Amino acid sequence: MTVIAVFGSAFNPPHLGHMDVIRQCLPQVDQVLLIPSARHPFGKKMASFELRLKMVRIILQETLNNPENIILSSIENTLKHSTNHPIYSHTLLCSLLADNLSRGTQAEYRLVLGPDNLKRQNWSRFFRFREIDQQFGVLAVNQRLSVRSSPLRQQLQDNQQ
């Protein structure tokens, strides 16, 4: 059975830390599915979905040379039109599973989590986190590069002025 790592992130902007997460996932799974957030559950303000998708494509090409087992998905952008609520990880995983079953294919999905979200106080904030553990499982990755999106956004904003 195909094992797919589901790596959801704001990707606002995508950076080398995200690429390192992908590198950590690849030896453990058959595919890595990158899913930019369309409506973040914790209310993050983000650049347009289209711009973030474009930036992810560029950094994938520049750093990882677009391997075939890395798939960039716009599923959250589709899902946001069916609800006024944030797109939760559990909702996303169930949607991916239902789509797979409707096509008659089987895959196991693992939610990618870094050390920050693996902390109990953060993980317990995830909608239906226990069901995610039981139905899908988690693929834990390390933060080997200290790169944060906030300073990058500020630097981009400063360069535009």
Please annotate each region the language model reported:
Residues 4-29, 33-39:
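N-terminal beta1-alpha1 ligand-phosphate binding loop
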Residues 23-27, 58, 98, 154:
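Short, well-ordered alpha-helices that flank and scaffold nucleotide-derived cofactor binding pockets
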Residues 72-161:
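Classical nucleotidyltransferase
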Residues 20-22, 47-50, 124-128:
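Short, glycine/charged-enriched secondary-structure capping and boundary segments
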